[in-house]
Amino acid sequence: MPSQKPTILLLNGPNLNLLGTREPQIYGSTTLSDVQERCLALASSLDVELRHVQSNHEGALVDAIHALRRDLPLAGVVINPGAFTHTSVAIRDALLGVGAPFVELHVSNVHAREAFRHHSYLSDKAVAVICGMGVDGYAVAVEFMAKRLKAQAAAKL
């Protein structure tokens, strides 16, 4: 049964568990735990439910996306797919198969980095793409998705 509140699934892909310690000159020193706490507080203030999943395993992310079906139509995804951005047809297909709107998020500006990072299997289907804002991009993405889901709910009344 769908939740009464809009639900945002915050997904973080491979190596994001190392946020704050891995290449801090690129990704900063804020940890994923800090990001999650900030996003949970923001979601609460916006009166939306937020669930967080981080995995280094593609199938676990696909399973989390599939589980979101129970919250449709008031559900959306904020995803930092990490390296799966450039390789995962499975995550793309899961997002499209579930049909929830999603925001693609990257801490760094992937377009200012190596050429292989310039291609995304998700961007053409995302409702928004945020990159290069550091961890501040998470709050922007959560707020955007919350507003979108609330507007969608209001339109159905």
UniProtKB/Swiss-Prot annotation:
Residues reported to bind substrate: N80, H86, D93, V107, S108, R117
GO biological process, one term: 3,4-dihydroxybenzoate biosynthetic process
Keyword Ion transport among UniProt keywords: no
Keyword Disulfide bond: no
Class in the EC hierarchy, top level: lyase
E.C. number: 4.2.1.10
GO molecular function: 3-dehydroquinate dehydratase activity
Sorted UniProt keywords: Lyase, Quinate metabolism
Intrachain disulfide bonds: none
PROSITE patterns: DEHYDROQUINASE_II
UniProt site (Transition state stabilizer): R22
Active site: Y27, H106
Pathway: Aromatic compound metabolism; 3,4-dihydroxybenzoate biosynthesis; 3,4-dihydroxybenzoate from 3-dehydroquinate: step 1/2
Pfam families: DHquinase_II
Quaternary structure, from the entry: Homododecamer. Adopts a ring-like structure, composed of an arrangement of two hexameric rings stacked on top of one another.
NCBIfam families found in the cross-reference section: aroQ, PRK05395.1-1, PRK05395.1-2, PRK05395.1-3, PRK05395.1-4
Its biological purpose: Is involved in the catabolism of quinate. Allows the utilization of quinate as carbon source via the beta-ketoadipate pathway.
Family of the protein in this entry: Belongs to the type-II 3-dehydroquinase family.
Record's protein name: Catabolic 3-dehydroquinase
Originating organism: Pyricularia oryzae (strain 70-15 / ATCC MYA-4617 / FGSC 8958)
